[in-house]
C-alpha cells in the first residue's frame, strides 16, 4: 500500500492511496484460503473445495471486503503516521471510471483512491493561573423569605362556597366545566370538568378569566379568546377559540396563615424548619446564578486567550443548528429580523461568530479535560438519564431504550456533565474574587447572556470520550 499526501491546506488534508494489483491478489488469496476450511458446498467434502472454485463463486464479494478493509487500514495508517485527529469521518473518492474499478476487483489492475480529511487543530494550552475573575454573590434577604412564605400560604389556603347568588370577584376561585371549539370543532386539550380557576391568577389564556368576573354558581357563559402567537401548541397558536363554560361554584379564599400548620402541609414539623428550607432553596437559586455568571466570565476569558483554525464543517454544522433555533424562535413569535432591529444578513454574521465561539470553546475544554484526565463516571450519566426519563411520564421505557441504543444520544447526556467538570477544574486554577451584589444585580445581565444560549460551549459537546463530543459538534 502506497500513501502519498497530495494536499495540506489549513485543516484540510488529502492523500492518494494506491493498492497494487499484486497486493490485492495476495489479500484475496489469503481470504479464500481461510474460507476453504469453513465453507460447505454441495458436491465437495469439507475442506476440499478447490480455491479456484471458491474464487468463481465468492471472489467478487470477498474482494469487495478486501477493498473495504484496505480503505480502513489506509485511514488508520494516515492518522497514525501523521498524528492527526479527525474532525469528521474521512471522505473516500474512488475512480470515476467503472472499468478501472472492475479491473481492480479482478486483481488485474492497481486500485487508486483519494482520502480527504478534515482534521482537528493542534494548539497548546495556556497558563490559566493569570486569569482573575469576579464572582458576584448575593445573600437571601429576610423579605424574600417572607414573600415566599406568603405565596406558599396563599397557594395552600382553603376555599369555601360564597353565599348563593354571589358574583365572582378577582381573588375568588370558580369551579368550572368547559368545552372549547375552534371553527366549530372541539379540539384536543380544550375541555375539562371540575377545573379550579383562581380569578386574577392569569393561568388560563389571556382574556379567559376576565370574562368570568361577575359569574354566579349555576350560570353558563360563552368565553371567546385568541391563543397567543407564541403558544406552545403550534396548531393552536394565533387561533380564536370559543368556550362553553358552566360555573359550578364560586368560592372565596380563606385566610392565608403562616404558622406551624402550614409547615406541616409541606412535611416539616415547624415554621422555623419551613423558613430554613425556603432560605436554603432561595440560596441555591442565587448560587446557581452566581455559577452561571462566573462560568460565562471564564468562557469569555478562555475565548480571548485561544486563537487557532477551526474545522470549517464543524463550524457550518454548529451555525446550522443555532440558525435553526433562531428561525424557529422568530416563527413561533410571529416576528421578523426587522422587528428585532436587524437584518437577516447581520443576524447570520453574528450567529456565525457565535458558532465559531462554541466550536473553539468546545475544543479548548476537550483538550483541558483530556490533559487533566477528567472522566464522567457512569453513575452520573445514569442519573442524568433518569432525570431525562422523568420528563416523559408514561413513556419511560421507550425513552430509555432510545438512549441505550443510541450512542450519540448518550454522548449528548455525558457532554454537559463533562463540561461542568472541566469548568470546575479550570476555576480551580484561576483567581476568583467574590463581589457582594444585590439579587437584582446578580440577575441583571441574564437576558443578554441568554442571547440564544449559544454563547456557552455546553451544546458544542466538549468531551474527549467520544468522537462526536471531541469534535464539539
Curated annotation (Swiss-Prot):
Enzyme Commission number(s): 5.2.1.8
Cytoplasm is among the record's keywords: yes
InterPro entries in UniProt: PPIase_dom_sf, PPIase_FKBP_dom, Trig_fac, Trigger_fac_C, Trigger_fac_C_sf, Trigger_fac_ribosome-bd_bac, Trigger_fac_ribosome-bd_sf, Trigger_fact/SurA_dom_sf
Region (Disordered): 441-473
Main subcellular location of this protein, as a coarse class: cytoplasm
Domain PPIase FKBP-type, residue spans: 171-256
Catalytic activity: [protein]-peptidylproline (omega=180) = [protein]-peptidylproline (omega=0)
Assigned keywords, A-Z: Cell cycle, Cell division, Chaperone, Cytoplasm, Isomerase, Rotamase
One Gene Ontology term, aspect cellular component: cytoplasm
Function comment: Involved in protein export. Acts as a chaperone by maintaining the newly synthesized protein in an open conformation. Functions as a peptidyl-prolyl cis-trans isomerase.
Comment, domains: Consists of 3 domains; the N-terminus binds the ribosome, the middle domain has PPIase activity, while the C-terminus has intrinsic chaperone activity on its own.
PANTHER family linked to this entry: TRIGGER FACTOR CHAPERONE AND PEPTIDYL-PROLYL CIS/TRANS ISOMERASE (PTHR30560), TRIGGER FACTOR-LIKE PROTEIN TIG, CHLOROPLASTIC (PTHR30560:SF3)
Protein name: Trigger factor
Organism the protein comes from: Methylobacterium nodulans (strain LMG 21967 / CNCM I-2342 / ORS 2060)
Amino acid at each position: 500500500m502506497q500513501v502519498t499526501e497530495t494536499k495540506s491546506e489549513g485543516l484540510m488534508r488529502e492523500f492518494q492511496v494506491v493498492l497494487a494489483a499484486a497486493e490485492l491478489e495476495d489479500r484475496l488469496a489469503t481470504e479464500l484460503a481461510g474460507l476453504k476450511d469453513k465453507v460447505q458446498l454441495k458436491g465437495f467434502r469439507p475442506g476440499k473445495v478447490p480455491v479456484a472454485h471458491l474464487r468463481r463463486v465468492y471472489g467478487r464479494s470477498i474482494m469487495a471486503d478486501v477493498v473495504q478493509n484496505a480503505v480502513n487500514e489506509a485511514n488508520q495508517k494516515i492518522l497514525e503516521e501523521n498524528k492527526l485527529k479527525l474532525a469528521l469521518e474521512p471522505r473516500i473518492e474512488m475512480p470515476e471510471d467503472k472499468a478501472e474499478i472492475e479491473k481492480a476487483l479482478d486483481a488485474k489492475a492497481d486500485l487508486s483512491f483519494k482520502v480527504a480529511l478534515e482534521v482537528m487543530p493542534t494548539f497548546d494550552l495556556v497558563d490559566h493561573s493569570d486569569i482573575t475573575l469576579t464572582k458576584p454573590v448575593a445573600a437571601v434577604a429576610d423579605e424574600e423569605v417572607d414573600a415566599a412564605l406568603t405565596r406558599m400560604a396563599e397557594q395552600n389556603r382553603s376555599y369555601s362556597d360564597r353565599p348563593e347568588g354571589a358574583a365572582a370577584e378577582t381573588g375568588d376561585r370558580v369551579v368550572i366545566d368547559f368545552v372549547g371549539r375552534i371553527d366549530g370543532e372541539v379540539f384536543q386539550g380544550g375541555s375539562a370538568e371540575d377545573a379550579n380557576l383562581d380569578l386574577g391568577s392569569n393561568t388560563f389564556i389571556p382574556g379567559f378569566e376576565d370574562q368570568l368576573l361577575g359569574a354566579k354558581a349555576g350560570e353558563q357563559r360563552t368565553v371567546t379568546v385568541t391563543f397567543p402567537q407564541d403558544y406552545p401548541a403550534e396548531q393552536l397558536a394565533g387561533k380564536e377559540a370559543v368556550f362553553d363554560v358552566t360555573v359550578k361554584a364560586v368560592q372565596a379564599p380563606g385566610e392565608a396563615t403562616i404558622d406551624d400548620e402550614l409547615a406541616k402541609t409541606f412535611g416539616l414539623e415547624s415554621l422555623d424548619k419551613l423558613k430554613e428550607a425556603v432560605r436554603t432553596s432561595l440560596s441555591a437559586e442565587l448560587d446557581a446564578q452566581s455559577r452561571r455568571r462566573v462560568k460565562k466570565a471564564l468562557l469569555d476569558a478562555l475565548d480571548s486567550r485561544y486563537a487557532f483554525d477551526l474545522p470549517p464543517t464543524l463550524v457550518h454544522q454548529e451555525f446550522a443548528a443555532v440558525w435553526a433555533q433562531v428561525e424557529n424562535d422568530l416563527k413561533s413569535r410571529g416576528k421578523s429580523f426587522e422587528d428585532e432591529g436587524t437584518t437577516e444578513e447581520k443576524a447570520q454574521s453574528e450567529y456565525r461568530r457565535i458558532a465559531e465561539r462554541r466550536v473553539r470553546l468546545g475544543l479548548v475544554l476537550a483538550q483541558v479535560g483530556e490533559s487533566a484526565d477528567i472522566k464522567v463516571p457512569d453513575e452520573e450519566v445514569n442519573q442524568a438519564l433518569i432525570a431525562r426519563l422523568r420528563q416523559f411520564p408514561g413513556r419511560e421505557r421507550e425513552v430509555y431504550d432510545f438512549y441505550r441504543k443510541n450512542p450519540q444520544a448518550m454522548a449528548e447526556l455525558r457532554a454537559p456533565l463533562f463540561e461542568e467538570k472541566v469548568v470546575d477544574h479550570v476555576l480551580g486554577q484561576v483567581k476568583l474574587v467574590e463581589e457582594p451584589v444585590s439579587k437584582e444585580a446578580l440577575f441583571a445581565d441574564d437576558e443578554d447572556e441568554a442571547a440564544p444560549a449559544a454563547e456557552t460551549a455546553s451544546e458544542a459537546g466538549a468531551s474527549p470520550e467520544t468522537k462526536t463530543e471531541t469534535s464539539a459538534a
